[in-house]
Amino acid sequence: MKALKQFLMRLARFLGLSAPPVALDQLADLAGKIEPRAKVEIPLAEPQKLILKDIAAGCRSSGSQRGETIVLFTGLQGTGKTIAAEILARDLGRDLYRVDSQRVISKYIGETEKNLNRLLTAAEEANVILLFDEADALFGKRSEIKDAHDRYANIEIGYLLQQLEGFKGVAILATNDEDNTDVSLRRRIRFVMKFPPG
């Protein structure tokens, strides 16, 4: 166990993270901390700034209620979704971690679920905000069942949605195309912010 902790500490340093508390040890291999910028210029229109303030107020009022702080940022690449997530994290006084979908998704049956469960548990304990960039990779539309693989993929998406709904923290899902996300996911989202092009 001591060797594992030392490995995680080295991994955290390699990823540019400070020495993490126990909960952050679990995050180190599935998400990377986004370091706050000294000054974040807000490239958002005034209505969007107001929406972001409303989202922050809603997150504060939700406290630690399960599933009450799922936020969807939707818009083309380069329209300000990540910067908006940084601003929201700063306003809430929490660290922001970008989830690496490549590390969460596994080709082995049951591993994706375990990884997401471990990630959400660690994020709750550490009280950090998770940014699922390109969320449709994890929470994409369920497909028509043609074989056992499709059936399992649909079951997996359902499980992931349940886990996210039970999460007692702030989860920001960013996607380039809202239509690529599962309909059940969209029903669970409390806040949606659209980022227009250009």
Show where each model-derived region lies.
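Walker A/P-loop NTP-binding motif of AAA+ ATPase domains
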Residues: 42-198
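Conserved ASCE P-loop NTPase core motifs with emphasis on AAA+ ATPases
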Residues: 7-42, 46, 56-57, 136
